[in-house]
């Protein structure tokens, strides 16, 4: 029989049977990162790089080999998760029907007089749900209460369920295989973080209050990351992409003055100042903004944002994406279901972020945004995501 090192090389090239690879004691040189626990699985093939073992990750890590730190806020607080993605079993209505404590208010640190979700007092099994629109790793939840007429209201305990289709839900379990009850809050404002023992793969996440103080009032955030781990900012916001690599079809000049130009190099997410975005010089579907990434990269998504011009709100409401490796031959991103150019939903105001992830990542050096619809003028700030 070949020596173990040679056998390992052969197995990597030829996909050995599980029983053969187990003989190598693959877990002896732990292939799991970040403290992950390697466990052999006899007579099973997991289907990725190695058969016959699996990695159990520490809290806050995910991936086949626990290679990804996975505790990013998923978008409730910053608005990346839209109101339409948040639902609940019921809503409390107070103050003569004028105050509605609806689920879309349940965003961490939201301010205001009515700033959280509360279920109806008649709801015997309340829940609030987030639709992430795609499968993601979910690794934890941050909860917070709120107040009504100076009364502290919060969840003291809750359960978490998750689903891939929005119909069949599984609860997170404890070591005794029972539905795990997570510790909640102790006052109206303090935040409490619960990290799951293992990440869950989910598109839908539900919180079920089980014990509450005064009322089951909630603001919260989900923690996790993308399944493929390739959704990092590529350098627009942090300026690692130089100005000269951001170009456009045209640029608007307020009052026709060069001093008041809305240059393509300003199209950086969250850029501040009086002139803080790219604005096209004319209206029409022939306008575009182009980013040169410097080399071919895997691009998995985009975050867009509008801007304000002397009080006038302006943004791109929908757009297409084109990509190229030579800046001469362009391909428009296709909707995998229809086979036609995909139109992505854009923004609805001048400041919120709108994230769109590609179902099929693209490999390209040059990326163009092609506005389809807009409010007032074509105005854009953005970040590209990938690795």
Swiss-Prot record:
How does the record say this protein sits in the membrane? Peripheral membrane protein
Q: Give the signal sequence positions.
A: 1-23
- Main location (coarse class): membrane
Q: Which GO terms describe its biological process?
A: angiogenesis; apoptotic cell clearance; cell adhesion; single fertilization
Tissues of expression? Mammary epithelial cell surfaces and aortic media. Overexpressed in several carcinomas.
Q: Which residues carry this modification: Phosphoserine?
A: 42
Compartments where found: Membrane; Secreted; Cytoplasmic vesicle, Secretory vesicle, Acrosome membrane
- What residue stretches are annotated with the EGF-like domain? 24-67
Q: What does UniProt say on post-translational modification here? A: Medin has a ragged N-terminus with minor species starting at Pro-264 and Gly-273.
Disulphide-bonded residues: 27-38, 32-55, 57-66, 70-225, 212-216, 230-387
> What's one GO-annotated cellular component?
extracellular exosome
Pfam families linked: EGF, F5_F8_type_C
Please indicate the residue ranges that the annotation assigns to the motif Cell attachment site: 46-48
Matching PANTHER family, A to Z? Answer: F5/8 TYPE C DOMAIN-CONTAINING PROTEIN, F5_8 TYPE C DOMAIN-CONTAINING PROTEIN
Per the record, what about its domains? The F5/8 type C 2 domain mediates high-affinity binding to phosphatidylserine-containing membranes.
Q: What is this protein called?
A: Lactadherin
Q: Which gene encodes it?
A: MFGE8
